[in-house]
Amino acid sequence: MYNELTKGDIEKMKEEIAERRSRTAALREEVRRTREFGDLSENDEYRSAKREFNKNNGRIRYLENMINTAKIIEVESTADAVGLFDFVTIYYPEDEETRVIRLVTTLRNDVLSDCISKDSPFGRAVLGAKVGDTVRVEVREGYSYPVTIQKIEKGQDDDSLPIAKY
């Protein structure tokens, strides 16, 4: 399966890879330096330095894999339908609540900031919907809930959305 990402996503990942690669030598040196502190079984500094070094290298591999397996998508939508990076005011009739979400790529998903992946059940339900449409969010087999699109404010792929950490 390929991750559908924008050119902006790819650029952000390349920037992070470059930044992390610039830190690799210093992290490697820290591992070497702390290794000299003595018995490795009781050397917390060494374990911490090694963990940071491995975390950095793991993130580089993860980002490179994401880039290598990405399918580049264009950010386009019609003026009256929900598209990628749009701000959408959603009404939940069952709870009588309103919420504003932003539809984003999987790499920029951040539920706590109301940035919802277009590939999530919620994202799939609202993508392409128009103001006034009531769509059903299929959470799992046998359970779904309705949401109504109240307002669409067109957004764009800007630098305000960081890529997600893992």
Q: Where do the PLM segments sit?
A:
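Non-DNA-binding regulatory cores of transcription-related proteins
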Residues: I73-Q156
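N-terminal intrinsically disordered, low-complexity, charge/repeat-rich segments that act as generic
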Residues: M1-K71
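Short solvent-exposed strand/turn elements
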Residues: P162-Y166
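Short A/G/S/P-biased low-complexity tracts
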Residues: D157-L161
